[in-house]
């Protein structure tokens, strides 16, 4: 029986989603151990988006197979019991057919990056948003966003060790919602390059600091060179929001 699970986690204390050979405390490892404790079956979980260390999730989706046929609510409650005290929560469980794949069946992925623009240190949002102390011109950031939407070669916005075969991606939607000191940047696409969202955010922040005009964003894209773009924004402001199937 295949189970589709929707999970939420605070990524602050984890090394990321994926199991790593010589490191422990990945979300995948802890989740699979929790599944084993209630089912007595060793499983491999497959996920919609492999988040890096420090990145959070509001609606991550994964799937796994068990020989036993449990009610969905039993699976949810049992996994959550064995996840205590980790900051991971199973929000929903659905039984699905064997054709469903958390990664390959995805039609669109949605991310959020949270910035707090003020001078004072963060307390409530510590490790859950990027504190940017320099005043940001959000209007300029919004204008820069328009150059990034659509289909482009995003070589300037990919990590140097990115393993994706092609740097060409389509940014279906990219918008900024600004309220007082909070700047929320929403991204939607079928898939993303490694660190693409965080490098775009770092570049938008540089634009907001008046390091360059919004129009220069087009030049950054056309350069197809990582050195032209801004810094890679820290992981703790990034959230995997949801995935469409």
UniProtKB/Swiss-Prot annotation:
HAMAP family: TruA
Free-text function comment from the UniProt entry: Formation of pseudouridine at positions 38, 39 and 40 in the anticodon stem and loop of transfer RNAs.
Leading EC class: isomerase
Name of protein: tRNA pseudouridine synthase A
InterPro entries membership: PsdUridine_synth_cat_dom_sf, PsdUridine_synth_TruA, PsdUridine_synth_TruA_a/b_dom, PsdUridine_synth_TruA_C, TruA/RsuA/RluB/E/F_N
UniProt cross-references to CDD domains, sorted A to Z: PseudoU_synth_EcTruA (cd02570)
Annotated catalytic residues: 52
Subunit composition and interactions: Homodimer.
One Pfam family from the record: PseudoU_synth_1
GO BP, one annotated term: tRNA pseudouridine synthesis
GO molecular function: RNA binding; tRNA pseudouridine(38-40) synthase activity
Species annotation: Ehrlichia canis (strain Jake)
Entry keyword set: Isomerase, tRNA processing
Keyword Isomerase: yes
EC number assigned by the record: 5.4.99.12
Taxonomy, superkingdom: Bacteria
Reactions the enzyme catalyzes: uridine(38/39/40) in tRNA = pseudouridine(38/39/40) in tRNA
Protein family: Belongs to the tRNA pseudouridine synthase TruA family.
Signal sequence, renumbered to the chain: none
Binding residues annotated for substrate, in chain numbering: 111
